[in-house]
Amino acid sequence: MKAGIHPDYNEVTVTCSCGNTFVTRSTLGKPALHVEVCASCHPFYTGKQKIVDTAGRVEKFRQRYGMK
């Protein structure tokens, strides 16, 4: 391998919005990374579904464009 062409590989602390924190290694130039979803709170891994209210968005779209 050539010397001096590879990025630095440092430890990064990842913090999720649910409060879960873990340490991994990355070429990211920052010591911390904030994410919205991790394996502790993602519906695929937890088996729980999150209800997303899209009915309001649909009604707003229909009113805006005159659809019934």
Curated annotation (Swiss-Prot):
Task: Please give the GO cellular component terms listed in this UniProt entry.
Answer: ribonucleoprotein complex; ribosome
- Could you tell me which InterPro entries the record lists for this protein? Ribosomal_bL28/bL31-like_sf, Ribosomal_bL31, Ribosomal_bL31_A, Ribosomal_bL31_sf
What does the Swiss-Prot or TrEMBL cofactor note state? Answer: Binds 1 zinc ion per subunit.
Gene Ontology molecular function? metal ion binding; rRNA binding; structural constituent of ribosome
- Annotated residues that bind Zn(2+) are located at C16, C18, C38, C41
Please, which domain of life does this record's source organism belong to? Bacteria
Q: Which cofactors does this protein require? A: Zn(2+)
- One BP annotation, GO: translation
Give the record's keywords alphabetically: Metal-binding, Ribonucleoprotein, Ribosomal protein, RNA-binding, rRNA-binding, Zinc
Role noted for this protein? Binds the 23S rRNA.
Which family is this protein grouped under?
A: Belongs to the bacterial ribosomal protein bL31 family. Type A subfamily.
Q: Which HAMAP family match?
A: Ribosomal_bL31_1
Quaternary context: Part of the 50S ribosomal subunit.
Q: What is this protein called?
A: Large ribosomal subunit protein bL31
Which species is the source of this protein?
Thiobacillus denitrificans (strain ATCC 25259 / T1)
Q: What is the lineage of its organism?
A: Bacteria, Pseudomonadati, Pseudomonadota, Betaproteobacteria, Nitrosomonadales
